[in-house]
Each structure stands twice: as structure tokens, then as C-alpha cells.
């Protein structure tokens, strides 16, 4: 497989100006099949941006990823089905869903996350099939949202929209659930268990938890299943700016991961202790990122000029392919300037991988 042929999508983020995001997506649509948007609650509205991108570009769209906490599955199911109405032949909508990251857990407790994701998926699927659902059949959602147990809802207007459901995660429980219930899985390179560090250390098979995914697949009634690898990358003509953005992204990861997860792929406490201490002291992400060694960030996020990124990206995609992944996307932070990053990726990086 050509390395570039694995890369089907690119992930953008709702922190940038909305119209600018749509313009960047227009550039990306010439080289990518899917534009993914992150969902962060405190950023711009993901459904609005995906709708604008779908209507303007005709590219496939997806969430990478949404989550069940603070989200109403009725609204999300409706948004996904509506987006599917904009898809031209050969393109589709993907609902990527996970258990919620640090920005979500800072706002609310993430109780029973695996069960909440499973209920969310089950409710959406029945709504997309046009079936009436009873709220009490989804007890955790019903309780969390204050819904009436005997209330019913249905989407009479849907016609079995083509919405793919993929689950993002790294732990054994979420991956086993993904294998059983979803149409695919997302594993991102900035998580230690699925990182370049895990591959290079020879620990990927031991720490990736993909055996749990396989157990879930054995129980699944769903035929199609796609293993998607998210390559976290930061590219710019300005190497220092690209690397700074990568360190910031890596800081968000090393600050949240249990030390044992980092140690299992070769990181020592001295690699990230100063960064974690700075965040704990309230110094902010940028200040903490300045304390993270670049060589640590490089194991989690590919970064630099286009020339810097090509070799590392090819290496990482090779590992991912050998591990059974068949699809990939370019993920956060993409670059300090999203427009520049997409232009460099499409004009200089991807052609060199062919």
C-alpha cells in the first residue's frame, strides 16, 4: 500500500475563525476524502461547521471526536442524519465518539463512560433506522438528561442515512466495546500506547490493547470494520513554530496520562516532570510546553518543516499498516497556521509519500 493512500482525512479544530475553517476545508477537499472536526464544548459549534463544510465542499465530514457527556444524543443523531443528506456519491458522514478528554472532565464528572458511549451509539442507530425509541431503555442517558422514562421519540424523516460510527480510545474496555458495537476504531499517535515511542520500543503489541478490540469483534454482528490511525502532526515552513505547536499538543497528553502508561513506552519521569509541575502550579499550557523536551514531543507528534515531516510520517504509517490499520488521517495540531499547514501537506508532503 502506498503510504499516501492510507491518508483519507484531515482533522481541523473549532478554535479558529469559522469562515476561515470552511476556506481551509475547501483547500483540503481537493486531497482528502473526509474533514474531521474536534468537539471540545468550549470551541465553535461542531455541527454548524460540519454543515457549512459539507454544503460548500461536498467532502465527507466527521467528528473526531464527540462524546456523550453534556451532549444530547437526539440532537447528535439528528445532526448526523441531516449531514448525510448533503453527501454526494462516494462520500459519507462519520460519527467519531469517545469518552471525553481533559477539557470535558474539567467541566463535569465522567461517570460510567463506556456504558454512556454504548447507550449513545445504540440510541442513534435506532433513530437512524426510523424506529421509535423509549427513553427508559437508555437509563444512564435518561437520568443524566432528566428525560421522561415513558417518553418516546422517532425520526420519521430519515431514510437509513449512511453514517459510520467509529470509537476513539486506548484502554482495553473502550476498545473491546468499539470492536463489538462500532463500525471502526480510531487510535491516535499522540497517545503513548499507540505512539511512535510504542512502535520504536517494540512495545506496541503489549501496550496497544488491540487484543481487546479483537475480542469485541468476535462478538460483533457488524460486518464492516475500519481501523483508523490518527497521525498527530504539526507542519510549517517555520520549524520552530511547528515544533512549538507540537510541544503544546504533547503537553496536553503527558499531563493527563498516568505515569505507568508513559513509562511502558520508554518515557522517564524526568522527561515530563517539569511540564506537569508547571501545569499544576497554574503556569498555563504554553509555559508548561516550553519545559517539555522536543525529543519527547517528537515521539508523540510529528513536527517540523515539510522535509522534516515526510520521513517521520512515512515511518509511522509503515508501523501503522503493519499493525493492521487501513485508514489514516492527519490530526492535531496540524500546524500553527491551519491554512499554511493544509497547503504544505497537499503540495509538498503527500506527493512525496506516493
Which positions does each model-derived feature cover?
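Active-site-adjacent structural elements that line small-molecule/cofactor binding pockets in enzymes
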Residues: 1-354
